[in-house]
């Protein structure tokens, strides 16, 4: 086992979860139970759970725009188009043409391929390229892109946050569901409903 509080340990924990499937109810997972956000889209809960198991400090939120905003506030963020990601970084996604024009998914970088692509472990995604990439119900290891690349992988990573390593004891209190910025505050239950509807093809207008 890798040393607690390290990127290696975070990756080890995440990889051990690959193959986990939600259920029996929709969006029901041990990750959501840990963050007290069960039965909601759980990619953020997965990252928080893995970080807690590994003793790594990440933003205390399951709302993906809020997590990105927190990393930016701490100066621990780098945009994808200029990034040099490292294993253990937290990747934030905005999938083109999925009906949600904002950061809407998060995962853990396990390897940088040094060609504009990375391998990530993500909760609540799909192993099938045709399945929902941000509400797919599985923990999967995925090949993702943050820059244009010769592999032809679609660019979906907006940027990366770098966690604080050092064997932290995280609490199991409910992470904030809101963003760190006033402009992005959304009730997590409402946002979860919006994301579910848009993933099924419904158009949500303001």
Task: Go through each PLM region and give its residues.
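Residue-level detector of alpha-helical secondary structure
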Residues: 191-194, 198-201
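Short glycine-/small-residue-rich flexible loop motifs, especially phosphate/cofactor-binding loops
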Residues: 48, 68, 194
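Cationic, hydrophobic amphipathic alpha-helical membrane-interacting segments
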Residues: 182-185, 199-205
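Short glycine-aromatic motifs
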Residues: 20, 71-82, 152-155, 202
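...with weaker cross-activation on analogous glycine-rich loops/strands in unrelated enzymes
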Residues: 8-11, 56-130
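N-terminal capping segments
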Residues: 1-56, 155, 162-179, 205
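Aromatic- and glycine-rich peptidoglycan recognition patches
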Residues: 4, 101-186, 194-195
């Amino acid at each position: 086992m890798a040393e607690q509080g390290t990127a290696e340990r975070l990756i080890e924990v995440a990889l051990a979860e690959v193959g986990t499937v939600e259920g029996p109810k929709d969006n029901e997972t041990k990750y959501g139970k840990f963050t007290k956000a069960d039965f909601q889209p759980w990619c953020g809960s997965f990252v928080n759970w893995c970080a807690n198991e590994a003793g790594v400090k990440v933003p205390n939120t399951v709302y993906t725009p809020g997590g990105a905003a927190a990393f930016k506030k701490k100066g621990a963020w780098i945009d994808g188009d200029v990034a040099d990601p490292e294993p253990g970084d937290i990747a934030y996604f905005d999938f083109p043409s999925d009906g949600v024009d904002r950061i809407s998914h998060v995962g853990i970088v396990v390897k940088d391929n040094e060609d504009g692509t990375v391998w990530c472990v993500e909760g609540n995604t799909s192993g099938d390229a045709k399945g929902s990439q941000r509400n797919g119900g599985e923990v999967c290891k995925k090949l993702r892109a943050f820059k244009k690349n010769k592999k032809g992988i679609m660019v979906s990573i907006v940027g990366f946050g770098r966690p604080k390593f050092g064997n932290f004891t995280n609490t199991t209190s409910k992470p904030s569901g809101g963003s760190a910025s006033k402009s992005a505050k959304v009730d997590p239950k409402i946002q979860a409903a919006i994301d579910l509807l848009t993933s099924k093809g419904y158009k949500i207008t303001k």
